[in-house]
Curated annotation (Swiss-Prot):
It is found in: Periplasm. Its main location: periplasm. This is Probable ABC transporter binding protein NosD. It comes from Pseudomonas aeruginosa. Belongs to the NosD family. Required for the assembly of the copper chromophores of nitrous oxide reductase. Could be part of the ABC transporter complex NosDFY.
C-alpha cells in the first residue's frame, strides 16, 4: 500500500531555495577551459549545467559535443564584456521567460 502525504511547507520552501541556488550565475572560468592562445579558449566535449558569465574579452570555441545550459531557467551564457566571440557551442534548456530576459546568449555589455 502506498501512502501519500502532503509536503510540509518548510520542505517546499527549502526545495524552492535549492532551485534558486542551482540557477546562480557562475564565472566562465569554472568550466574546464583549455588555453588555445592569448584570450582564446576551447571548451571540451561534455555537458555543463548552469549559467555562465563571460566578463572579459575572449574567444570561446566549443568542441563537438560540448553542451551547456541552465536546466530550464535563466540564460546559458551571459556576456558582460566587449570583444567576445563564441563559436560552435550547443546551448540547451535555457529559460523561456522573456520578461526576465532569459536567452541562450544574453549580451549585457
Amino acid at each position: 500500500m502506498i501512502r501519500y502525504t502532503k509536503l510540509p511547507a518548510t520542505c517546499a520552501v527549502l526545495l524552492l531555495a535549492a532551485g534558486s541556488v542551482m540557477a546562480q550565475v557562475q564565472p566562465i572560468s569554472t568550466l574546464p577551459l583549455q588555453a588555445q592562445g592569448e584570450n582564446r579558449w576551447l571548451l571540451p566535449a561534455g555537458e555543463y549545467h548552469g549559467q555562465f558569465v563571460i566578463d572579459q574579452p575572449m574567444q570561446l570555441r566549443c568542441a563537438a559535443g560540448a553542451c551547456c545550459g541552465p536546466t530550464g531557467q535563466g540564460s546559458a551564457l551571459i556576456i558582460e564584456a566587449s570583444d567576445v566571440s563564441v563559436e560552435g557551442c550547443t546551448l540547451l534548456n535555457w529559460g523561456r521567460d522573456l520578461t526576465a530576459m532569459d536567452a541562450g546568449v544574453h549580451i549585457a555589455a
